[in-house]
Amino acid sequence: KKFFFIAALIFSCIITNAQNVGSSPEYIKLLTPDWKGERFADGRPKVSDAILERLKNISIEEAWGVLRNKGFQNQFESDWEIINPGEAMTGRVVTAQYMPLRPDFEKQVKAQGKIENRAQQGGTNSWPIDILTPGDVYVADGYGKIADGTLIGDNLGNSIYAKSQRGVIFYGSVRDQQGLSKIAGFNGWILGA
């Protein structure tokens, strides 16, 4: 009896610790409680297009000054490689975080993705692209991985732009930057290119 109780307890802990691949609207709202405006169905704050357009006209220094004055001291990272440095990019973010690929972990992530009706063809790096809407910027943490860790090339870059009319901010690497730079309107801030 004791063995079955312990086995049942361990099994229930595994089940309760299972995580969704994507964040629920409730979790996103929990992380953004100060937002009082409209939200998307997925819970993200719906910053107006008018504000996004106004933000294109301010400098990095101005934005950084406002953030620091509001108590956001850790929101700046330098040394980005910008695909089109003369073009401003603003948008609402869709975030993703990647860890170095492990076959055992990938199997579990793909199984959970199947439960969440995510595409099973190709890699998981297409999943955030699938949910982009006009005005979104795809922000991904790839742990700065360069070798065997590119998140997109120009094919996925075209898909990102078709869905969002924006671009990407990646702490990681991309391939075919020349092809990405030829996508009219697309931009990317890459740290680890």
Regions found by a protein language model. Name each.
Residues 1-19:
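Bacterial Sec-dependent N-terminal signal peptides
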Residues 19-39, 50-52:
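Short acidic, Pro/Gly- and aromatic-enriched capping/linker segments at domain boundaries
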Residues 37, 128-129, 177:
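Short, surface-exposed secondary-structure edge patches
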Residues 43:
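Phosphate- and other anionic-substrate recognition elements at nucleic-acid/protein interfaces
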Residues 46-119, 123:
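N-terminal low-complexity or amphipathic/hydrophobic leaders
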Residues 121, 125-171:
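Extracellular/luminal Protease-associated
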Residues 146-149, 176-180:
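Short, well-ordered, mixed-charge alpha-helical segments that flank or form enzyme active sites
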Residues 169-174, 180-193:
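Phosphate/pyrophosphate-binding betaalpha-module
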